[in-house]
């Protein structure tokens, strides 16, 4: 009797344990893309990943004040910062805006290609690539192992940025420890130059897919925003107009160490914020939390960020 009861209890315990065992944690994220329609044009935000930025050291502002401002938003420094790119499909051409960091920043970045594929495209589908500027986290994804990733694409960039970053003469005018950016730009772009797949433009030029280049010099000598117009709707791709939403939407005058011309970068940001808030169009930021698309609303001397509302496309 005791033996039978013991076996019954043991079996019950085993079944009970199996029934209430927790499911294994998956520890994976959904694919890093977000899709929306702007009029009849499809826009896909693509995540290259995130990186930790010591923004208390990088922002041109007292470090303790930066930490205090971040704390208001339950954030801290180093700040996990998104690196975003964008794909524009007007039904005739497929345009990629920026390419992420590639292999240059470690495993937390370099996810652009797999997210392009998750979004239903391949690198061979890309017709043109518009570079906002030639910092490595925007052009690193152009190559892998020294070879072109986007074999069918023409890469476009503002002439001022190309003339600066791709110039051996310009590089030789800066100290040796400041030449990494030049070398990285040359490594990423030269394979396209040699293949006849690189073309510059001047600010204000209308490019493919109803996209117009917009001068935003300051962060780099040829930093460019891109304006996409679709009927009565518009979206402006900001590039690196700003980096830290928690600080720079409240205090648009705060610059960052990456800005090559601090005064001009500040002016461009102040003007762009005011225009976006006044006209209510969408903006997309390379370092705003993914997907980085939203609108600005003025709030006295500051601005409120209104992220795009999620709208499924099924």
Model-derived features: positions:
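Metallo-beta-lactamase
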Residues: 22-23, 110, 117-121, 125, ...
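Active-site environment of divalent metal-dependent phosphoester hydrolases
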Residues: 31, 54, 134-141, 164, ...
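Divalent metal-coordination and catalytic microenvironments
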Residues: 40, 88, 98, 126, ...
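Conserved beta-strand hairpin/beta-sheet module of binuclear metal-dependent hydrolase folds
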Residues: 29-119, 225-242
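Gram-negative bacterial Sec-dependent N-terminal signal peptides
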Residues: 1-21
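Cap/insert and terminal regions of metallo-dependent hydrolase folds
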Residues: 227, 231-314
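Active-site metal-binding loops of divalent metal-dependent hydrolases
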Residues: 48-49, 99-102, 134, 160-161, ...
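Active-site metal-binding motif and surrounding structural segment of the metallo-beta-lactamase
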Residues: 85, 91, 107-156
